[in-house]
Amino acid sequence: MARAKFERTKPHVNIGTIGHVDHGKTTLTAAITMTLAALGNAQAKKYDEIDAAPEEKARGITINTAHVEYETASRHYAHVDCPGHADYVKNMITGAAQMDGGILVVSAADGPMPQTREHILLARQVGVPNLVVFLNKKDMVDDEELLELVELEVRELLTNYDFAGDDIPIIAGSAKEALEYMTKNPKAQKGDNEWVDAIYELMEAVDSYIPTPERDIDKPFLMAVEDVFSITGRGTVATGRIERGIVKVGDNVELVGIRETRPTTVTGIEMFKKSLDQGMAGDNAGILLRGIQKTDIERGMVIAKPGTIKPHTQFEGEVYVLSKEEGGRHTPFFKNYRPQFYVRTTDVTGTIQDYTADDGSTVEMVMPGDRIKMTVELINPIAIEQGMRFAIREGGRTIGSGVISKIIK
């Protein structure tokens, strides 16, 4: 029933809860929905509804993720919560649920744990730009000094992974106490209860500290080529989904990837067999290009605003390798393994030159189910950039999923 009043008039931000298992991420997610539901800005979700997260498939990998949505006075949020640690790792790497920012949940009673570190590292590697911290289970800590120590430890950990550890807002509270109070008093407002107030304080920090992301439509134009046709008398048409930006008839563009980059001009844009003046992010369109033969362009190239993307052959990637149960390989692989890397619309063969563990040590052998950093050299240059997702395939089946953490050349 309450569905209808979610009008998208406010800026939209994707966020998620991250942190160690059992530190209270799901309880916090439930507490946020209950608290904002009292203002009519969310649909209250119980812990069980979020915890029983449905399975999703992203790039051939099964992930359990719960999605909730809510509003604050200034924004509309889509919030993702993964119950299991493995689901988190997979979600972060596949980008199944993109995050513009995260709420790092740390138990004040336990302090940072190994998974806390791993999630902060992953957030850094896969490009979750900003974090806000919720020190949970404050009700279980009697000693103020202990709370301060945990906060210092968290700030130091964030700084170690290149986040602004000194500036990140840290809010202490108890998701469980807030949830219990809201369950008994579903109309409770700010000022009624200290634990509920901590949830308001957290959301105010998220509102002010996590910036509104630049919308795809405001970024420079890019479309990955999926198919190419010649139309007699009109020239060559490349079709695909416009990934970002706006393209207008008469715009100068570049064809990037696989071969030498070359300039051309857009002479027409078509959608659903109709001619348009412009195409924008999200559109599936056909783009007519001046002076380009059908043989000059192929799937896997991108058409982009001049100078905004370059072709590369070597990169570092953070990769999750599918387990045997997930349909991945049954056997390990080693240095100089040569699978295909599926980027945007095409497979490119590449050689894996080395593997690195989180602590920077070299790894010789990679097992199905591992998460690993790898250096890859592609046989053809293609338009890639930091933060892009890719799949690793072998004979057409996905055996791994990754994100580009650094462009080398």
Curated annotation (Swiss-Prot):
PANTHER family: ELONGATION FACTOR TU, MITOCHONDRIAL (PTHR43721:SF22), ELONGATION FACTOR TU-RELATED (PTHR43721). Its EC number is 3.6.5.3. This is Elongation factor Tu. SUPFAM superfamilies: EF-Tu/eEF-1alpha/eIF2-gamma C-terminal domain, P-loop containing nucleoside triphosphate hydrolases, Translation proteins. Residues 60-64 are annotated as: G2. Residues 174-176 are annotated as: G5. GTP hydrolase that promotes the GTP-dependent binding of aminoacyl-tRNA to the A-site of ribosomes during protein biosynthesis. It is found in: Cytoplasm. Keywords: Cytoplasm, Elongation factor, GTP-binding, Hydrolase, Magnesium, Metal-binding, Nucleotide-binding, Protein biosynthesis. InterPro entries: EF-Tu_GTP-bd (IPR041709), EF-Tu_GTPase (IPR050055), EFTu-like_2 (IPR004161), EFTU_2 (IPR033720), G_TR_CS (IPR031157), P-loop_NTPase (IPR027417), Small_GTP-bd (IPR005225), T_Tr_GTP-bd_dom (IPR000795). Residues 19-26 are annotated as: G1. Belongs to the TRAFAC class translation factor GTPase superfamily. Classic translation factor GTPase family. EF-Tu/EF-1A subfamily. It catalyses: GTP + H2O = GDP + phosphate + H(+). It is an enzyme of class 3 (hydrolase). The keyword Nucleotide-binding applies. One of its GO terms (cellular component) is cytosol. Residues 136-139 are annotated as: G4.
